[in-house]
């Protein structure tokens, strides 16, 4: 009886392994699905030029075509609700063109009425006061806070695109003339 019982238990173990593998592999063949977990509106004027979240998926940001930047909570915290604005910034100057970032890039460029352009990126400073992680959103200017001259004649930029690396930037722009 011992050999028969042992053989039966081996078959049961093989069946259990088979069903476990089927349970693990079956979701691969299901169709993709997506569902909304939260929805909120932000009180920002202008069209959205760029919308994104920081790497921890806790703070989102929205750059408008008018140069207004709002940082908002994506996940609720003890004191902060989802969608609550937690920081604001403004790109200074009379904005006439916006170049949204290329895929995988974290930079946006604004063109101004005086033929200059400025590259901006969201920056998140992390600190640990009293052993609590705090993320402070702000703007960073990787090519300096002084706008770069694109059109030496000072004509307003109406359309522009750009590509940037760590220390170089290439820009193509159309002026109003």
Regions found by a protein language model. Name each.
Residues 1-13, 17-177:
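WD40-repeat beta-propeller superdomains and closely related acidic/aromatic-rich repeat-like regions
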């Amino acid at each position: 009886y011992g050999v028969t019982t042992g053989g039966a238990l081996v078959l049961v173990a093989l069946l259990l392994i088979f069903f476990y593998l089927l349970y693990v592999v079956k979701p691969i063949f299901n169709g993709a699905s997506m569902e909304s977990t939260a929805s909120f509106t932000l009180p920002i004027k202008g069209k959205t030029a760029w919308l994104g979240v920081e790497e921890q998926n806790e703070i989102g940001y929205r750059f408008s075509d008018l140069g207004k930047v709002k940082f908002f909570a994506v996940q609720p915290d003890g004191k902060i609700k989802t969608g609550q604005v937690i920081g604001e910034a403004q790109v200074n100057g009379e904005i006439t063109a916006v170049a949204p970032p290329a895929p995988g890039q974290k930079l946006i460029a604004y063109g101004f009425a005086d033929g200059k352009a400025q590259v901006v990126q969201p920056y998140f400073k992390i600190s640990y006061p009293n052993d609590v992680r705090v993320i402070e959103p702000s703007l960073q200017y990787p090519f300096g806070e002084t706008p770069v001259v694109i059109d030496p004649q000072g004509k307003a930029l109406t359309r522009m695109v750009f590509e940037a690396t760590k220390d170089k930037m290439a820009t193509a722009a159309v002026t109003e003339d």
